[in-house]
Amino acid sequence: MKDKTGTENVGKFYNELKECIECGNCTFWCPIYQQRPEEKYVARGKNQAIRDLLTTKGEYSAEMKDMLSMCTLCSTCAQHCPVKSKFQSIMIGARADQTKAKGLGLLPWLIYRQLIPRRKLFGSVVRCASYFQKLFMPKAEGRMRHLPLFLSGLLQGRLIPAIADCYLRDLVPETNKVSSGTQTRYKAAYFMGCATDFVFPEIGKKLIEYLTRNGVEVIVPKEQGCCGAPIWLGAGDFDTGRTIADTNVKIFNEADYIITNCATCSSAMKEYAKYLADTDARLRRYSDFSKKVYDIS
């Protein structure tokens, strides 16, 4: 029974599935389709495949898994769609149903359920990765590093950002008062996000300094973790996503404003209610939480 198709989540967006007029306009804009011009990798093809899957009560095959994974959720197709189909919602729902039906697999299970939700453990693993990076990844311009030679050839010499020597949570206090001689106008909690915390802490530090100079007292809860975007938006693990969302709601419960400089974090947290709320209580909590979130990037 576990392999059978689930429709609990994607079924909520069945009307969006029916909106597609199969005009093919998405083929001109999809970044995945530009690299892999196959019908199954563009919104039109995915829409049809998901409709067929729901109609026939089929199963999530390996081909379907591959098709669902080939989407960055950039919404470029939706922005240029003549009927404004909300394809992103369809993809997120289908990924959740696929994960519920087929499971995550060992490596994603280790990363998304056992590592990322445990912030201290995650930070320790990232710290170990930073040592590996210094040993085997030559430094390039600025804060970027080359992949090791044996991978660089396979991945076209790509660069990745260097992991910071000191995380943001270790650079700033939990309570950051406004600058001397400045009147406190607002009090806001700061959601760092993984990239700012581990890779670009100087951005977060400068943001806090700017806000405190302009009358904003900034609280940085040290127990905060990931927004959950890679887990429930990317991997479709709604169960772990709810656990993370519940934790964030609890940590930031007393905040009047929640600010972040990460667009991914802000968009993910604002969508908790739409995708993850499976009870009336969660719907209320997530809705109240999302109203406090502000992207200040």
What do the PLM-derived regions correspond to, one by one?
Residues M1-G6, Y33-E63, K84-Y112:
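Non-heme iron-sulfur electron-transfer modules
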Residues T5-L17, K57-L68, V178-S179, T212-N214:
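Short, intrinsically disordered, charge-biased short linear motifs at domain edges
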Residues Y14-Y33, S61, K65-S85:
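Cysteine-centered iron-sulfur cluster-binding motifs in ferredoxin-type domains/subunits
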Residues K18, P37-Y41, I231-D239:
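Alpha-helix capping and helix-loop boundary segments enriched in small/acidic/polar residues
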Residues N25, E39-V42, E217-I219:
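N-terminal glycine-rich anion-binding loops that anchor highly charged ligand groups
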Residues F28, Q48-D52, D66-S69, S75, ...:
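N-terminal, well-ordered alpha-helical segments
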Residues F87-S297:
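Iron-sulfur cluster-binding electron-transfer modules in prokaryotic oxidoreductases
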